[in-house]
């Protein structure tokens, strides 16, 4: 049935390559959604008082451009996420997406223009998020993980 071009009845080959590709797409989605959050935060911080007025936005084209780029990053993140779901089990990919919360917090407290305080309770929360993502991503000893 190799010559059949319909694809009916064929099982996808399970190899390490799709699993790696899936993790790369998850990583792309995480990085893009993080960039989107930071770009939109920076953009709205540059506007006088938050008003959804076209006049205010047109008077500040750079923040508007950065906000638009942030929305574009969300769109690209969605494309990466859809690709990730093709190659990665949902019960692995979705918890890994939570690392974006930790990454946004860590970058927001690290970038001086955001002036976000580093708070001990939140830092512990970030550690728990990252630990949870690692625990979900660990392959149990003696068990194989399917690519789909």
Curated annotation (Swiss-Prot):
Pathway: Bacterial outer membrane biogenesis; lipopolysaccharide biosynthesis. The keyword Iron does not apply. Keywords: Cell inner membrane, Cell membrane, Lipid A biosynthesis, Lipid biosynthesis, Lipid metabolism, Lipopolysaccharide biosynthesis, Membrane, Transmembrane, Transmembrane helix, Transport. Gene3D superfamilies: 1.10.3730.20. One of its GO terms (molecular function) is carbohydrate derivative transmembrane transporter activity. Residues 1-23, 85-91, 139-148 are cytoplasmic. It comes from the Bacteria. It is a multi-pass membrane protein. The chain crosses the membrane at residues 24-44, 64-84, 92-112, 118-138. It is found in: Cell inner membrane. GO terms for cellular component: plasma membrane. SUPFAM superfamilies: Multidrug resistance efflux transporter EmrE (SSF103481). Residues 45-63, 113-117 are periplasmic. The keyword Heme does not apply. GO terms for biological process: lipid A biosynthetic process; lipopolysaccharide biosynthetic process. Its main location: membrane. NCBIfam families: PRK02971.1-2 (NF002816). Translocates 4-amino-4-deoxy-L-arabinose-phosphoundecaprenol (alpha-L-Ara4N-phosphoundecaprenol) from the cytoplasmic to the periplasmic side of the inner membrane. Heterodimer of ArnE and ArnF. Belongs to the ArnF family. This is Probable 4-amino-4-deoxy-L-arabinose-phosphoundecaprenol flippase subunit ArnF. The lineage of its organism: Bacteria, Pseudomonadati, Pseudomonadota, Gammaproteobacteria, Aeromonadales. The gene is arnF.
């Amino acid at each position: 049935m190799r010559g059949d071009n319909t694809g009916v009845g064929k099982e996808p080959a399970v190899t390490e390559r799709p699993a790696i590709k899936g993790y790369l797409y998850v990583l792309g989605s995480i990085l893009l959604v993080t960039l989107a959050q930071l770009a939109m935060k920076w953009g709205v911080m540059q506007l006088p008082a938050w008003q959804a007025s076209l006049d205010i936005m047109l008077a500040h084209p750079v923040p508007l451009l950065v906000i638009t780029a942030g929305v574009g990053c969300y769109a690209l993140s969605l494309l990466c996420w859809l690709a990730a779901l093709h190659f990665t089990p949902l019960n692995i990919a979705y918890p890994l997406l939570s690392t974006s919360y930790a990454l946004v917090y860590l970058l927001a407290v690290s970038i001086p223009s955001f002036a976000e305080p580093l708070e001990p309770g939140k830092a512990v929360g970030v550690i728990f998020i990252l630990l949870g993502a690692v625990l979900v991503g660990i392959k149990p000893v003696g068990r194989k993980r399917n690519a789909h």
